[in-house]
Amino acid sequence: MRWDCHIHMVLDGENWRQAIARHRDGVQEAWVRQQLETYQALGFGYLRDGGDRWGVGKLARDLAPEYGITYRTPLAPLCKAGHYGGFIGQRYETLKEYAALVAEKRRQGADFVKIMISGLMDFDRFGVLTEEGLDEQTIRELVHIAHQEGFAVMAHANGPRTVEAAALAGVDSVEHGAYLDGEALSAMAQAGTVWVPTLSTIGNLRGRDRFDQGAVTAILDSAMENVQKFASLGGLLAPGTDAGAWAVPHGSLTEYALLEQALGPEWETILCTGAEEICRRFS
């Protein structure tokens, strides 16, 4: 069985605005079924969605059992107003508003909570993020509130201090995790954080002219080196493509290929262990 522990059913890997517009007047069931058929044909038995506020992931979860797939979704991801994530998630201004949204997720039947706590990689400039992460105290409160409500927490997080803060706060999984240093990697390993590095979002940019290829190569090399280091620390790693992101189609197998390249002969055992932990925590 294959796992993809980070997808966005609402997106299509080509144009995020057009992809979202496809579902603005109602979720297109035929589209969702087509993607599920693709995953089924490739042997995927578990999918974890990063969320959307239009109900696309929710419908996919409802339909997935027909295709022999276990599907988990946070419904809409939660992001702080004025920071990255508003294009796909629900915004909050204060921790009180965040807590109310988490409680709402419980009533709506979310499987877990997804938080956005940093910016994105700038694929034209190695080492640069589009914005700084949230402060350590805020991250700690976000994780605590969701855990108090009984949810596991998936965190979009880049940058060493942001990821370290998330790990120390007890976050259940870190997504992306660009530009980590030894302290951040050790914090995740010691806390038992599952890292989903989404290498496909970088590797699939190679050979395309949208971004500076020198920067893309440097970013990918850095990420793969950190994957190797994290594995050597005994850290938990799980495969997740971020399917739907630009140049990452649904049903992509590139994540497995990149992680095999980074991890070597033990790659299957390492990924199976991490994926099973994702399945357990985000049940």
Over which residues does each language-model region extend?
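Divalent metal-dependent hydrolysis catalytic cores, especially in the metallo-beta-lactamase
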Residues: 29-58, 68-78, 110-123, 152, ...
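Metal-associated gating/positioning segment near the N- to mid-region
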Residues: 2-63, 82-84
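Histidine/acidic residue-rich metal-binding segments in metalloenzymes
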Residues: 96-116, 122-195, 216-237, 282
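Active-site gating loops and adjacent loop-to-helix segments of metal-dependent hydrolytic enzymes
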Residues: 8-31, 68, 73-87, 120-135, ...
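Glycine-rich anion/phosphate-binding loops
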Residues: 52, 90-100
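Active-site environment of divalent metal-dependent phosphoester hydrolases
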Residues: 8-12, 53-57, 79-81, 119-123, ...
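Histidine/acidic-residue-rich catalytic or RNA/ligand-binding cores of hydrolases
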Residues: 13-17, 163-169, 202-213, 223, ...
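His/Asp/Glu-enriched, well-ordered alpha-helical/loop segment
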Residues: 220-283
